[in-house]
C-alpha cells in the first residue's frame, strides 16, 4: 500500500513533489532503474496527476528520470558522463565564486559561515547525514551569496542532481562527513584571510573529491551506473 505524504498547503504542490522525489532519488530511497507511476505518486500525495506530471518533467530536465510516453517513467541510472560534466562545470563556477567571495566577505558573513560549520559538526556528532547533506549545500550557497552571484547557485542546482547521488552514496566510507568538514574549514580559513589563491586551491581540492569517490562507488554498485 502507498503511504500518503502530507504536503504544505501554502506552497506550490508541484514544487513540493519535485523536491521530495528528488531527495528520495538522490538518497537512493528510489533506486536507479525503478519505475515511477504518475498514478502511484498522485495517490501518495493525494493530488491530481497534473502537479505530478510537472514534477516529473523537472526531474527529467535534471537528468534524474526518463519519461517515455505510453511506456511509463523510470529512475535513470547514474550517468558517468553527467557526473564528469557536472563536476567540471561546478568546479569552474565554484572556484571563481570562492575567489570572488574572498575579496568581498564581511565579518557578519564570516559569522554566518561559522554558524553553518558549527551545525555541520553537530550533525556529524549526531550521525544525522541528511542534515549534514543539506548544511553542506547551504555552505556552498552562502558563498555564492557572499560573492553576490546567486545565479551561480541556480546554475549549479540545475546541473548537480546526478553528482548529488554520488555525493550521498559516498558518505558511508569513501568521503566521510568528517573529511568534508575539514575541507570546509580549510575553505573558511582562507576566506577569513581574504586569500583568493588559497581559497581557490582549497575549493579545487574539495570538489575534486567526487572524482575519487565515484570510482569506488561504481565498483561497489556497478548495476546503478551507465556510461551515457
Curated annotation (Swiss-Prot):
<dbReference type="GO" id="GO:0003677">
    <property type="term" value="F:DNA binding"/>
</dbReference>
<protein>
    <recommendedName>
        <fullName>HTH-type transcriptional repressor RspR</fullName>
    </recommendedName>
</protein>
<dbReference type="Pfam" id="PF07729">
    <property type="entry name" value="FCD"/>
</dbReference>
<dbReference type="InterPro" id="IPR036388">
    <property type="entry name" value="WH-like_DNA-bd_sf"/>
</dbReference>
<dbReference type="InterPro" id="IPR008920">
    <property type="entry name" value="TF_FadR/GntR_C"/>
</dbReference>
<dbReference type="InterPro" id="IPR000524">
    <property type="entry name" value="Tscrpt_reg_HTH_GntR"/>
</dbReference>
<dbReference type="GO" id="GO:0003700">
    <property type="term" value="F:DNA-binding transcription factor activity"/>
</dbReference>
<keyword id="KW-0238">DNA-binding</keyword>
<keyword id="KW-0805">Transcription regulation</keyword>
<dbReference type="InterPro" id="IPR036390">
    <property type="entry name" value="WH_DNA-bd_sf"/>
</dbReference>
<keyword id="KW-0678">Repressor</keyword>
<keyword id="KW-0804">Transcription</keyword>
<dbReference type="Pfam" id="PF00392">
    <property type="entry name" value="GntR"/>
</dbReference>
<dbReference type="InterPro" id="IPR011711">
    <property type="entry name" value="GntR_C"/>
</dbReference>
<feature type="domain" description="HTH gntR-type">
    <location>
        <begin position="11"/>
        <end position="78"/>
    </location>
</feature>
<comment type="function">
    <text>Repressor of the rspAB operon. Acts by binding directly to the upstream region of rspA.</text>
</comment>
<feature type="DNA-binding region" description="H-T-H motif">
    <location>
        <begin position="38"/>
        <end position="57"/>
    </location>
</feature>
